[in-house]
């Protein structure tokens, strides 16, 4: 794909996301997206077959951005680092937090989150399969449990169902990942057992 085609696709995606925020639940048409992207309707069809295709492309683009952020922060050296995953997610989402809040309230499975879960589970499983002595189905279960839990909590926070500051949320999810529901007591540290 040449730069001009990529620029047109990017304009279509941006127009689609902007209209999603503005219209909040009202039907968006291809004509509206084309007009907002400053292209002809027939140009839209040169790049996408439907608005669903645009939504999936937008999700893929955001996921690609997240993977770059995760790589930059070396997340894949320790892919079960909840705190780092939360901070990387937030780095991606913060600039467009109103859009993500809206989309997470409407139908979180339609945009980004389901692709995120599938991709992260696949990546974690691939990365760890040669590093951990664990049968592949068990490793996949751990990855699914971890990623599904993190994304569910993050979506609930975006929906403002969990009224905690971001840093506290990230910290608590990290504790839950390490200790489960049995939060360690202050006297249960390694220092007191020595």
Kindly label every feature range from the protein language model.
Residues 1-23, 27, 32, 36:
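Basic, helix-initiating cap at the start of DNA-binding domains
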Residues 29-30, 58-67:
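Short, basic, alpha-helical segments at the C-terminal edge of helix-turn-helix-like DNA-binding modules
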Residues 29-30, 50, 165:
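Residues that mark the N-terminal boundary/hinge immediately upstream of a DNA-recognition element
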Residues 38-48, 150:
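Short hydrophobic/aromatic patch on the recognition helix
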Residues 70-98:
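Hydrophobic alpha-helical connector segments
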Residues 107-132, 137-148, 182:
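Amphipathic alpha-helical packing segments from all-alpha helical-bundle domains
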Residues 148, 156-194:
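C-terminal peripheral helix-coil segments that are non-catalytic and often amphipathic
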